[in-house]
């Protein structure tokens, strides 16, 4: 049964003005649902597939307030990184078949962006650098992605954290390149996700070796939420209380055991997601064109029943300018999640039985606790002194603010995400392959360009 999830806490804090706002489009949900984009602005037509110049996509998205529509379809071969201006709406669904695909360089959204039915498949053919995500952004306000497809990155496929009022819904985040030239060697990462009211729902996350996803937490000490004027519907006392992430109804396939994070504090909901392990979780090595290729396994991959790993903030994983967050983890509300192993064993409501903890948490009466030496979580959260340290329970009894999201069971989400996620108006063969592999429990082994992909 479908139901609207809107927490008591969220309802109490939401102002009357916010409730009266108009959604970005029919079906816009989560914390970015009221983004206005280019509403009321000029309609601009993209009339060619050129990288730049009159009629190009790059020219259209330079400045707002604009609504971008497409008279053409096909691949736009970017010649440099693309930064989208503020107050822009991109309606990829207006393109004729087969839709619009952006290639070769990273795409960054701006403030107050609505981006729908767009494919961003970066690749390593034209440019290799350690920060080469397919798409990413931080320190912005008001972004909603709907039915977009992201793949083929050198760093992460899609990283969004330390943004205000963000939604990524019905998107595919898949197939980062395993070893395309990153200075750290083999990478293949999904994304770093977080935000000051951020929603990630009904997304397909697949074929990754790590960060599927990694929750960012408050470890960087970002305080940009204090200047949020457009969507200032909540008031927070500090960046830990402001960090609120809702992760629900997503499908993780062949990325099992790679969800982790939350260092530095925050509130994270993990609700009704479906975690399905793929063949690479049991594969130790394979041979391709006569080459023996190792595949990540063991602790690096995580076990097939893992929901998430709770990460403690340290000098090694957090901002060295903010040691006040060291020793802290996020707090979690975890409910309704399903795991499926490569042997077909399905476990409903795995939830807290699938959570593991970094060293540095505290145990008291059978419960795990995070340090909170400076009372960032506030007096409203019960504290317990353990070994002389003031701590808070990691498990939350009630969900953090969710925005308004139509929520399905994990099993229903699996079917719906495979049917409708990504730029599915004209689903390309790449997304179609991901969905078929998730259904059948299979993978592809391909030698693509310089990066050897093992899935």
Please provide the spans of the model-predicted regions.
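Right-handed parallel beta-helix
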Residues: 87-92, 111-122, 139-152, 164-182, ...
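Acidic Gly/Asp/Thr-rich repetitive segments characteristic of extracellular carbohydrate-active
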Residues: 23-68
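Extracellular beta-strand/beta-solenoid scaffold signature
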Residues: 102-106, 127-137, 152-160, 181-195, ...
